[in-house]
Amino acid sequence: MKARFRIPMSEDKAYAYLLAAIMAEVEYRHRVFCSNEDMEKQLQEMAHWLTTPSSHFGILLCGGCGNGKSTMLKAFQQLLNALHIPKPYNEGTYGIRIVDAKYIAYLCKNNYEADRKLISVDMLGIDDLGTEPSEVMDYGNIYTPVIDLLTKRYEEQLFTIITTNLTPQQIREHYGDRIADRLNEMVKKIVFSNGTYRTDQLATPG
């Protein structure tokens, strides 16, 4: 049985660390941090999943534009970098690579070797799922880059965090029943139902 990654700390401590990482990310973007009930709920769900047993081996952060999804993903990346959690068998420390969904399609067409490596990294963040072309053509061959990547990560049970503006129904329509059903098995869904932070008054853009 493949072990699931979990942060070795209490849920409350993970919440506090994630909050600090989000505040740092907002400050890095020269914005003003503003907490609210929606963000607190999202943080609580994220902290709970990261510290407790679950059959899911990934997270889907879904919701409208500009409401904190990408910020949450980047904050988690910064938290991992700061914690230096050791991997088994002296293989270094955990870290997550983040790529835009459109970059996955680009790699598939332009750098096959890098594409194969990306598919199999132990921790991957996919930002803006659904913005990429569904298919790419290379020398007459048609590929489905994101579908192929998600299929491989499902089969290998690899840790994956995804952000998307698509609803679950739109994901099913866009990627088909097979991928939608596999995502249901792969990921814990955290819904970002709040409005955009991309205003002159508020912060935490996503």
Segments and roles (model prediction):
Residues M1-S55, I190, N194, T199-G206:
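A short, basic N-terminal segment
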Residues G58:
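Walker A (P-loop) ATP-phosphate-binding motif of ABC ATPase nucleotide-binding domains
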Residues P88-E155:
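Conserved nucleotide-sensing/catalytic segment adjacent to the nucleotide-binding pocket
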Residues G66-K69:
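Conserved glycine(s) of the Walker
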Residues L61:
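Hydrophobic anchor at the beta1->P-loop junction of P-loop NTPases
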